[in-house]
Amino acid sequence: MSTNSESNARTMIGKVVSDKMDKTIVVMIERTVKHPKYGKIMKRRTKLHAHDENQVCRVGNTVKIRESRPLSKTKSWVLVEVIS
């Protein structure tokens, strides 16, 4: 049952911008969107808090995170792997 819910969970790839909290990292996700009227391609950024159990991430690392149940008020993502 848990494998089915894990396969449906969203995953994102982003860059670590903060690792100052215990077992928590802040990951910036950057995406491009097209303006609906003018058609200009714009960058949009989202910061997500993710759980880093073993505290292996450092600022500047590229990581993959997966959506999970809420772990705190702002944290509902879990670190899957460090890409670089």
UniProtKB/Swiss-Prot annotation:
GO CC terms of this entry: cytosolic small ribosomal subunit
GO biological process: translation
CDD domains: Ribosomal_uS17 (cd00364)
Keyword terms, alphabetized: Ribonucleoprotein, Ribosomal protein, RNA-binding, rRNA-binding
InterPro entries: NA-bd_OB-fold, Ribosomal_uS17, Ribosomal_uS17_bact/chlr
Molecular function, one GO term: structural constituent of ribosome
Pfam families: Ribosomal_S17
NCBIfam families: PRK05610.1, uS17_bact
Oligomer and partners: Part of the 30S ribosomal subunit.
Membership in a protein family: Belongs to the universal ribosomal protein uS17 family.
Function: One of the primary rRNA binding proteins, it binds specifically to the 5'-end of 16S ribosomal RNA.
The protein, known as: Small ribosomal subunit protein uS17
Organism: Legionella pneumophila subsp. pneumophila (strain Philadelphia 1 / ATCC 33152 / DSM 7513)
